[in-house]
Curated annotation (Swiss-Prot):
Pfam families: Ribosomal_L3. Gene3D superfamilies: 3.30.160.810, Translation factors. One of its GO terms (cellular component) is cytosolic large ribosomal subunit. Part of the 50S ribosomal subunit. Forms a cluster with proteins L14 and L19. This is Large ribosomal subunit protein uL3. GO terms for molecular function: rRNA binding; structural constituent of ribosome. Residues 136-156 are annotated as: Disordered. Keywords: Ribonucleoprotein, Ribosomal protein, RNA-binding, rRNA-binding. Belongs to the universal ribosomal protein uL3 family.
Amino acid sequence: MAATLGILGRKLGMTRVFGDDGSIIPVTVIQAGPCPVTQVKNLEKDGYNAMQIGFDEIPERKVNKPEKGHLDKAARGYFRVLKEIRLDGPVPFEQGMDVTVDIFAPGEIVKVTGTSIGKGFAGVMKRWNFAGLKKTHGTEKAHRSGGSIGNNTEPGKVMKGKKMAGHMGARTVTVPSITVVDVRPEMNLILVKGQIPGPRNGVVVVRKQG
């Protein structure tokens, strides 16, 4: 997948807007940027093209000395979130410049990366949509279990990747092919069609889909 421009933002929640034909469009509102460019990497020096951007400014006392020394080079403040955006071509921004929602336009297709909502420890029926065992006919205390988890002596182990009960959610999820419905630069807002990963106020990365 192509490495393209992107921006950091915060998921504010969902609402709806009306299309030109009067149709109702469910949208997610993302407050994105402005994100100062804290570092620029290029092919000659670093082996690849990328830019590091910051989001959610914090006071100096909340960063350690290595972070402070790194961010002082850009002289744009200190940030809770730093993200490196890798690019296929040269970086169109210089260190210290701002990346804003202006890089997107209504109708554009983007991909959104966020951390899914954590559900805690979940069984196989909730986590993997297993059917469970029979409700009657001798089933005892195992109605929601996963059943057999492997073979006998050969291979004598549970195979890697076997779907079992465990921690559900709280994983990095990328949803591609999302349509930008509206961009409002005066409020640093992007409205995208449908839902995106993560809880309300969760940090997301919005990138152009190459």
